Design a protein with these regions (language model features):
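Charged DNA-binding/catalytic regions of mobile-element recombinases
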Residues: 1-298
Length: 298
């Protein structure tokens, strides 16, 4: 009975401490484990199987935080995050690690006017198409760098615009913006925030924003924290889509990134959204809005 209690609470308390309090030896605990599988052991086996399936589905991208709601949802009951973490470590099911590349993508030495920081690190949005972030990132290939321009909707952390090129011309960021505008068709009043790079400060880019009634906001010089959620999204793309890949061509990299963006938007659980995907977060918001409208019409 004592051994079973220790096994049931090993994620919450130190095994050594529990053995001392209950006056049992660790060797006795090990012997008890070697007899017949306890209910806890059987349950752990089932949890590990679910973790393995989830890591296959998400290609090894999930760590303990995202794996916990994933497995809990599959099993239909809450599983302690410490238990998930321990089982992942013991079974070599940990997620991918971050690795950094160094390439300069912000050209702030230009003659274009720089907009003030209207956003002021207020990353909260009450609805879609209120606040967008934009930035450039890059992917190594055997042919050279592939530059990627992204546009992120802050409300659901959804990637709503993207474009790719072997160089960083103004047309690259403008193409990503046009994808976002075509897909989302935002009303006037949206705030568009980016760094102070020439691609975003250029007249053509700002003219498109002005024509749609979009307010321009730019980070302070050299302060990446002013665009932190966008920097985080770029880092996620690097870790989960690039780090463990070897792209021979830019075309290959572009295909994989486009596929990943679809996964990021529709399947990947996001920590800022209560660990649901951007698409699910927006779906729940729309359902709540529809329910509220029905209630007010009664």
């Amino acid at each position: 009975m004592k051994y079973a209690w220790i096994e049931a609470n090993r994620d919450s308390y130190s095994v050594t401490m529990m053995c001392e309090i209950l006056s049992v030896s660790r060797s006795g605990l090990h012997d008890a484990r070697g007899r017949e599988p306890s209910l806890r052991t059987v349950d752990n086996t089932q949890i590990v199987k679910r973790i393995q399936r989830a890591q296959l589905k998400h290609r090894g991208r999930y760590g303990r935080r995202r794996m916990t709601p994933e497995v809990s949802e599959i099993l239909g009951r809450p599983i302690n995050h410490k238990r998930i973490g321990r089982l992942m470590r013991e079974n070599d099911l940990s997620s991918r690690k971050r690795r950094r590349f160094r390439v300069v993508t912000t050209d702030s030495k230009h003659a274009h006017p720089v907009a003030p920081n209207v956003l002021e690190r207020d990353f909260a949005a009450r609805a879609p198409n209120q606040k967008w972030l934009a930035d450039l990132t890059y992917v190594p290939t055997d042919e050279g760098w592939l530059y990627v321009a992204l546009v992120l909707d802050l409300f659901a952390r959804k990637i709503v615009g993207w474009a790719m090129s072997q160089t960083m011309p103004q047309e690259l960021t403008l193409a990503a913006l046009r994808v976002a505008l075509g897909w989302r068709d935002p009303d006037p009043g949206l705030v568009h925030h980016s760094d102070r790079g020439s691609q975003y400060a250029a007249n053509d880019y700002r003219d498109v924003l002005k024509a749609r009634g979009i307010t321009v906001s730019m980070s302070r010089k050299g302060d990446c924290w002013d665009n932190a959620p966008m920097e985080s999204a770029n880092g996620t793309v690097k870790v989960e889509c690039v780090n463990d890949e070897h792209f021979k061509t830019r075309a290959e990299a572009e295909r994989v990134i486009v596929e990943y963006i679809g996964y990021y938007n529709t399947e990947r659980r996001h920590s800022a959204l209560g660990y649901v995907s951007p698409a699910e977060f927006e779906r729940r918001w729309r359902a709540a809005m529809n329910q509220a409208m029905k209630a007010t019409s009664l």
